[in-house]
């Protein structure tokens, strides 16, 4: 048994390791929230197709989108970003683009003919698609700006 033990809670942390942990925490949070946002958006679409609007789900999706924006800005404004972080952001960018294309197709295919469904339900479904598309487009724009900022930092262009 040694006389001295090292406690991780009191270890030496320099500025770079703190910055790196802040970036990795933001990326982990970003990943979790994007997955959660995809799940909730699918729930929102299913609920709106049934003709019932749920304000709690809409607010939850909006709040999650705002958290994602904060995480993206944290990563974008950091000084220490690796190429792995960049590829992670690019993968999420591709996922969002695919999701938006899928929703565009679904919106175009929404045609209710003689099924007895009222215009209120149709408008609700279209509204939910438009709101989700707006949120994901906003996140996509932030991702693109973050990726370009990270590329410039890696290349040394300010």
Predicted regions span which residues?
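Short, conserved micro-motifs composed of acidic
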Residues: 1-25
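Non-transmembrane amphipathic alpha-helical segments
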Residues: 34, 41-44, 68-75, 103, ...
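Terminal accessory regions that mediate trafficking to/through membranes and regulate activation
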Residues: 3, 21-46
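Short amphipathic alpha-helical heptad-repeat segments
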Residues: 26-38, 55-69
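Intrinsically disordered, low-complexity regions of eukaryotic proteins
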Residues: 16, 21, 62, 73, ...
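Charged, low-complexity interaction regions
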Residues: 43-58, 74-86, 111-115
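Membrane- and interface-active hydrophobic/amphipathic segments that mediate membrane binding, fusion
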Residues: 27, 34, 38, 85-158
């Amino acid at each position: 048994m040694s006389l001295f033990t090292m406690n991780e809670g009191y270890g030496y942390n320099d500025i770079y390791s703190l910055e790196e942990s802040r970036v990795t925490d933001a990326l982990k949070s970003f990943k979790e929230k994007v997955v959660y946002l995809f799940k909730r958006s699918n729930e929102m679409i299913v609920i709106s197709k049934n003709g019932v609007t749920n304000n709690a789900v809409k607010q939850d999706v909006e709040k999650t989108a705002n958290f994602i924006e904060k995480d993206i800005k944290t990563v974008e404004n950091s000084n220490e970003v690796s190429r792995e972080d960049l590829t992670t952001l690019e993968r999420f960018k591709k996922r969002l683009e695919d999701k938006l294309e899928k929703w565009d197709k679904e919106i175009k295919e929404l045609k209710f003919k003689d099924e007895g469904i009222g215009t209120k339900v149709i408008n609700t479904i279209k509204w939910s698609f438009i709101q989700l598309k707006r949120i994901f487009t906003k996140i996509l724009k932030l991702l693109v700006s973050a990726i370009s900022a990270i590329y410039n930092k890696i290349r040394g262009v300010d």
